[in-house]
Amino acid sequence: MAQPGTLNLNNEVVKMRKEVKRIRVLVIRKLVRSVGRLKSKKGTEDALLKNQRRAQRLLEEIHAMKELKPDIVTKSALGDDINFEKIFKKPDSTATERAIARLAVHPLLKKKIDVLKAAVQAFKEARQNVAEVESSKNASEDNHSENTLYSNDNGSNLQREATVISEQKVKETKILAKKPIHNSKEKIAKMEHGPKAVTIANSPSKPSEKDSVVSLESQKTPADPKLKTLSQTKKNKGSDSSLSGNSDGGEEFCEEEKEYFDDSTEERFYKQSSMSEDSDSGDDFFIGKVRRTRKKESSCHSSVKEQKPLEKVFLKEDTGETHGDTRNDKIKPSTETRKLESVFFHSLSGSKSSRRNFKEQAPKTRSLDFPQNEPQIKNQFNKKLSGRLENTKQQLQLPLHPSWEASRRRKEQQSNIAVFQGKKITFDD
């Protein structure tokens, strides 16, 4: 049956038509049998007349049932509580009333009607509950709408205040943004004047540094005039090439690197230069002047290369002064030996004859060493082969994987199975 929430009584009545027709057929069959029994009874004339009247009444009910529509039967059964005995005791009851009462009282139809009545009652109760719930919802919605109106008013006021505050903040930020622009311009102007002052401050320190470099190079310059000229020409070439490559960013980096020199080291080198008794001091001073003019145009790359050997010499000179004059006398021959080494190009430190001899001797030594090394190579090869064989033997002796071991055992068992030696049976036997 239909649920009370979705009950439609007309649809239920239409669904009951088949049931009513089936019950009507059953009731008519029963009435026909009873009419036949009443007519077949025997007795007195009064009893026979009574039976004939009953049979006639039943025939009228049968004809009324045939003309009745099933919807009328179901609606009358749902509407009123039909009592069959009361209707039959009435003397003025019609055949249709009796026919409807007979059909409604039938037990099959009565069950269906009772279920429909319960569904209708539940549907009515549900409708009442829904109405109560809707009324409560409407009341709550009214209260909620009032609250939302108040909240919307408050929210609109807050939004207006927030917009006013945001507009004020935007104006303040614009004003502040204009001020830093002027400040930044002033800072840029200061920064432009600043580097000039820095360069002016650093410029007095350059001559002293360059003098120290000249004094160092006076110790490092070779004694032979040929080597002097070679090193000088190489330096000039390197400075010209570096000028073409790095002209912009070199000067700044050089100034940063030159700031690492200390005044103490400069004074020490002045002392060393004054104490030195070399005969070529005048020439070294002249060469230092020339280099000073070249260094003004040189790039950062050459200055960085100069500083690395200079720092090493600083450390060595410090140790020399602490140990005294006796230590200085020992250091002088070592410095004289170093005079043959070039500061920038280490390839010039050796003589040309030594390089030629090395080139001539190199192929001879290679050709001589090869046959001598042959037996050693053979011995090494034999050792490697023997080691590999031992490794393979050890690997064979190691325990195998369970799957490999099982397959090996299975193969052994198959090889051990004896060949069938009995007599083959044929169909002829």
Swiss-Prot record:
Keyword Mitochondrion: no
Residues in cross-link Glycyl lysine isopeptide (Lys-Gly) (interchain with G-Cter in SUMO2): K190, K316
Cellular location(s): Cytoplasm, Perinuclear region
Composition skew (Basic and acidic residues), residue ranges: 183-195, 296-341, 357-367
Phosphoserine: residues carrying this PTM: S203, S205, S264, S279, S281, S349, S351, S367
Segments of skewed composition (Acidic residues): 249-265
List of residues that carry N-acetylalanine: A2
Subunit structure: Interacts with SRF. Forms complexes with SRF and SRF cofactors ARID2, MYOCD and NKX2-5. Interacts with the N-terminus of SLC2A4.
Physiological role: May be involved in regulating transcriptional activation of cardiac genes during the aging process. May play a role in biosynthesis and/or processing of SLC2A4 in adipose cells.
Name of protein: Serum response factor-binding protein 1
Organism: Homo sapiens (Human)
Encoding gene (name): SRFBP1
